[in-house]
Amino acid sequence: MNNARPIRRALISVSDKTGIVEFAQALAERGVDILSTGGTARLLAEKGISVTEVSDYTGFPEMMDGRVKTLHPKVHGGVLGRRGQDDDIMEQHGINPIDMVVVNLYPFAETVAKEGCTLADAVENIDIGGPTMVRSAAKNHKDVTIVVNAHDYDRVIAEMDANEKSLTLETRFDLAIAAFEHTASYDGMIANYFGTMVPSYGENKEGDEESKFPRTFNQQFEKKQDMRYGENSHQAAAFYVEANPEEASVSTARQIQGKALSYNNIADTDAALECVKEFDEPACVIVKHANPCGVALGKDILEAYDRAFKTDPTSAFGGIIAFNRELDAATATAITERQFVEVIIAPSVSTEAVEIVAAKKNLRLLECGEWTTKTTGFDVKRVNGGLLVQDRDQGMVSEDDLQVVSKRQPTAEELKDALFCWKVAKYVKSNAIVYSKGDMTIGVGAGQMSRVYSAKIAGIKAADEGLQVEGCVMASDAFFPFRDGIDAAAEAGIKCVIQPGGSMRDNEVIEAADEHGMAMIFTGMRHFRH
């Protein structure tokens, strides 16, 4: 049975007019009659395309400043009418079959994102007729084609040319799924926007914690990649991304070469890239199992890489390397000659570096683009039966935010190192301890249930690599509940500690620092990472 349906009449009404003139022209050239509304009809007519206004077809004018345009039985009957079943009643009421609906919706998201957007502005950008037509056409995909994305225009024309001006059921069904996804996303955005106004009517109060999180949490992501497996081989997995991510990230990165990214590759690459973004100077971050195992600054990224690698060469094997400058030939050579690496990610990659890395055909090389600022948003963590939703941790202190609580003031070099290792500690799994000196990590203790043991591990790591802890700065992602961590740090040779403060025993901890002649800095900000 032939399931193809010829396209003889199309209704076109779009807010985003990207490519619509060319698409409508192509349809007209293939004998398709075009119905249209408002601005779309005017644009097509101006371009010399024959168009019938919907109001002329229905005999009912657009009204209420365009609020009512397509909500008419002659429109929806033409879209919803089942071919071979509803033909008689359609003819009886003068309803012509509409074979294709081309619609995208009012720009609600763009409107509410604008500074100064009022509730009235938002309300006027809630599309009613558009989603109704989209859902009607998608529901009747057995006979009708729905097109909501401009990137499908060429595909539709190509299939019409290859199939006697018809489209197959497989294509119509695929486009219908895209249409339902489109309206689901649209309604989700509206629900989220109004959900922030609960419980009272009015404008969203920015900064009001009660209204920041809507009553229902609606998010939509597009599948970018199916994976061989997830975190473990018995788990199925896929990678989904936001529809239009604004910030340079692993989600937006272009893969230049290498094997397909695995679940763990993506998680680790995200950790490495987000860490390296914290630094303005040329920086390198090496990550293993979502923890930085080596971080350093340098006069260029080659020096930064060399120093980061020295922190923990053993853990760096099979790791992820992120840079905040273009990957150049010298650095690419150093990496490929020195170690096995799973992924390298950088804002850009030189032509020479691409050629060098090509010798390691399995090495995944990613180019993510430049970044300026970090976008706001939510972090989401699944628990059994629910989601934990919070703001992204974009907090970071500057020198002006620091409070020296010890008798001894930190030296200029200690202060610089303190800020450096505080940035690193933010990206180490709690309990996190980082030793650093001269803008280079010396030891990293991650993920221990005891903060003291994280400190011990950082010292063991440093000793194993022949790195000198004496004179280092220590960063702790959260406060020290007892003085034992400071005593252990002093015994290891730590001279300066940076930590959030806030313990009930802060005075005892500060006294311990003073007894050991250490400088102690409070940030007033914690960076738990679980």
From Swiss-Prot:
Q: What is its EC number?
A: 2.1.2.3, 3.5.4.10
| Pathway connected to this protein | Purine metabolism; IMP biosynthesis via de novo pathway; 5-formamido-1-(5-phospho-D-ribosyl)imidazole-4-carboxamide from 5-amino-1-(5-phospho-D-ribosyl)imidazole-4-carboxamide (10-formyl THF route): step 1/1; Purine metabolism; IMP biosynthesis via de novo pathway; IMP from 5-formamido-1-(5-phospho-D-ribosyl)imidazole-4-carboxamide: step 1/1
Keyword vocabulary terms for this entry: Hydrolase, Multifunctional enzyme, Purine biosynthesis, Transferase
Catalytic activity, reaction form? (6R)-10-formyltetrahydrofolate + 5-amino-1-(5-phospho-beta-D-ribosyl)imidazole-4-carboxamide = 5-formamido-1-(5-phospho-D-ribosyl)imidazole-4-carboxamide + (6S)-5,6,7,8-tetrahydrofolate; IMP + H2O = 5-formamido-1-(5-phospho-D-ribosyl)imidazole-4-carboxamide
Gene Ontology terms: cellular component: cytosol
Q: Does the keyword Hydrolase apply?
A: yes
SUPFAM superfamilies in the record: Cytidine deaminase-like, Methylglyoxal synthase-like
One Pfam family recorded for the sequence: AICARFT_IMPCHas
GO BP, sorted A to Z: 'de novo' IMP biosynthetic process
Q: Which PROSITE patterns match?
A: MGS (PS51855)
Residue span(s) of domain MGS-like:
1-148
An example Gene Ontology molecular-function term: phosphoribosylaminoimidazolecarboxamide formyltransferase activity
Q: Does the keyword Zinc-finger apply?
A: no
InterPro entries this protein is in? Answer: AICAR_Tfase_dup_dom_sf, Cytidine_deaminase-like, MGS-like_dom, MGS-like_dom_sf, PurH-like
Q: What's the entry's take on its domains?
A: The IMP cyclohydrolase activity resides in the N-terminal region.
Q: What is the similarity comment for this entry? A: Belongs to the PurH family.
PANTHER family, sorted: BIFUNCTIONAL PURINE BIOSYNTHESIS PROTEIN ATIC (PTHR11692:SF0), BIFUNCTIONAL PURINE BIOSYNTHESIS PROTEIN PURH (PTHR11692)
What protein name is recorded for this chain?
Answer: Bifunctional purine biosynthesis protein PurH
Give the taxonomic lineage as stored in the record.
Bacteria, Pseudomonadati, Pseudomonadota, Gammaproteobacteria, Vibrionales
From the UniProt record, report the name of the gene that encodes this protein.
purH
